[in-house]
Amino acid sequence: MKNYIVTHTFKSKEAKAKMIEVTGSKSMEDMTKAMTSDNAKCQMSWNTPGDNLTMYCWWKGTNPDAINKQLESMNDFYEPHKFVECTDDVIDFNAK
């Protein structure tokens, strides 16, 4: 699978608050299941503070369509997702 950094932009402050409420009520196991399929899997997510309506996720997927399919149930919260494909060449500045 390919690596993608995906930018998710909430439709409103209310949509962001609702998403935080929904995810806060789920177990990590349930969230992982919801973000995993044979063709797409969320690796990590970064939320932004305050009124910033953007969040970022690192996905592994066969293509953006597979990731969009995995995210279908959350489309009420977000504007269309933006994808940047990344290589497997990672520079880990924390590695020793």
Mark where each language-model region is.
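Short, flexible helix/strand-to-coil boundary loops that buttress conserved ligand/catalytic motifs
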Residues: L71
